[in-house]
Design a protein with these regions (language model features):
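Signature of the first transmembrane helix
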Residues: 2-7, 14, 28-87, 127, ...
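Hydrophobic alpha-helical transmembrane segments
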Residues: 142-149, 175-224, 394-398, 411-436
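Membrane-interface junctions at transmembrane-helix termini in multi-pass inner-membrane proteins
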Residues: 154-176, 358-360, 364-391
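Short membrane-interface helical motifs at transmembrane helix boundaries
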Residues: 54-57, 121-139, 333-351
Length: 459
């Protein structure tokens, strides 16, 4: 899966109509939008695995693909971290206005201004640091630096478009924006390969521009239209945005930290570039449990949202424990599967080699991250946004320290950093959850929606 989307939550789980007393039936119908968004998510996930395969066929070797893989990872470490919270808050606010019969045009204008400002600040920071980024990460290639800036900017309208589509219940448009990104990336990459293009920079621009065709298509069809309404205030669209943004930036960086760190720590030789690319293959394969986690959410979170809205806390806790058991099961199966089958899959699909130990460590880190993410969502549901930001921040610091001090072996130090960072984040969230429960904090429908949407991953 891509360096990271998991926005089945944007199908507005909490808005599923109640069809009777919860005690009469434990079954919850699939929320509106689950099917189209699920299809878009599937397309995005499958094409993400195919992208590096097509790029390798086009460029001829693992070491030739490494700059493109590094650009791709960097893009999804930056864009979701900064823009997913805007998408989430825009969708939440528009859905609320739609429910009370108010137009959302002023809300979109507010969030658009915020997005432009955020994109501008991050772009200026990237430009200021560009000499260091180019020399330390892109091996002196300024074209890839330009592609990174363009890619980051291109994902701003993509995320805002998804927020508008989701908040207005236009889930087909949401799925088109999501799925078209991966589909366009594959088609353009394959076209360059057929033409025999070997220039890495052109493949970089494919990564940069792939989000835009889907946005332009749904805009042309009027799916991003909003109605006039009462003036929007900053308080309406940013009640928890600061903490959500901070936590999202740390979480997105952490889920992509493995390939990022491996690229920075490699010595730049052909052999090391080959190893970094193969490591990236392993990271993508190890994320399959995270992809399955989204399916688990789709099945259980609609009921949790309804229970929270009714203040049925005992049932909410029971449902959350069921979710945690499934998450743990997915994590165990994923780790065992990576150990037993991971090297074979890497060999057959990517024509590369990766050890069982490396695959198992990567899958373990991914599984622990998944558990931490599930607990973090529960903390957000209990209005612990600041605690979640703190937990992801502690995880990020742990990754840096452990990767720096633990070993001199490239893969081992990064693997240990990933596992240790997920463990510290998990422990922090578990302590925060216990604290929020003991203090008597109760979830609300809105806080659960924020929790459901809090998936800082992109496929």
């Amino acid at each position: 899966m891509d360096p990271s989307d998991a926005h089945l939550g944007h199908a507005q789980f909490g808005d599923t109509p109640d069809s009777g007393d919860a005690k009469t039936s434990s079954r919850v119908p699939l929320p509106e939008g689950t099917l189209p968004v699920g299809i878009g998510l599937l397309i995005a996930g499958v094409t993400s695995y195919l992208f590096l395969k097509v790029a390798k066929v086009a460029l001829g070797s693992d070491e030739a693909v490494q700059p493109i893989a590094s650009l791709w990872i960097a893009t999804f470490a930056l864009a979701p971290g900064f823009f997913l919270p805007l998408e989430q808050e825009l969708a939440r606010t528009l859905a609320h206005r739609r429910a009370i019969g108010q137009g959302g045009q002023p809300v979109v204008a507010r969030v658009r201004t915020l997005g432009i400002g955020l994109a501008g600040i991050v772009t200026l920071a990237a430009l200021a640091a560009s000499p260091l980024i180019v020399s330390g990460y892109f091996d002196g290639d300024w074209v890839l630096m330009l592609a990174l800036i363009l890619a980051f900017s291109a994902y701003a309208p993509a995320h805002l478009s998804r927020g508008i589509a989701s908040g207005n219940g236009r889930f087909r448009a949401y799925a088109i924006v999501m799925g078209a990104d991966g589909a366009v990336r594959i088609v353009l990459c394959a076209a360059l390969a057929i033409l025999g293009v070997k220039t890495v920079g052109l493949y970089g621009f494919v990564v940069a521009l792939s989000p835009l065709p889907g946005v332009l298509y749904v805009r042309a069809r009027g799916a991003l239209r909003t109605e006039p309404g009462p003036e929007s205030t900053w308080a309406e669209v940013t009640p928890n945005l600061g903490w959500l943004l901070l936590g999202s930036v740390f979480a997105a960086a952490l889920v992509n930290a493995g390939p990022l760190a491996a690229t920075l720590l490699a010595d730049g030789s052909v052999g090391q570039k080959r190893l970094v690319t193969r490591f990236t293959y392993g990271v993508l394969l190890a994320r399959i449990p995270l992809f399955l986690f989204q399916a688990v959410q789709a099945a259980l979170l609609p009921r949790l949202s309804r229970l929270a809205a009714r203040n049925e806390i005992a049932e909410f806790r029971s449902g959350f424990m069921r979710l945690m058991k499934l998450v743990l099961l997915v994590g165990v199966v994923g780790t065992a599967g990576a150990f037993l089958l991971g090297p074979l899959v890497i060999e057959k699909f990517y024509d590369a080699e990766l050890s069982r130990k490396t695959m198992a460590m990567l899958a373990l880190g991914s599984a622990l991250y998944m558990v931490a993410l599930a607990i973090a969502q529960a903390v957000i549901a209990l209005r612990g946004h600041a605690l979640v930001a703190l937990g992801w921040g502690i995880g990020a610091v742990t990754f840096v320290v452990v990767t720096w001090l633990s070993s001199d072996e490239l893969f081992r130090r990064v693997e240990l950093g990933l596992v240790a960072s997920s463990i510290t984040a998990l422990i922090t969230f578990a302590l925060a959850l216990r604290s929020r429960l003991r203090s008597g904090d109760l979830p609300s429908g809105q806080s659960v929606m924020e929790a459901i949407n809090n998936m800082p991953l992109e496929t």
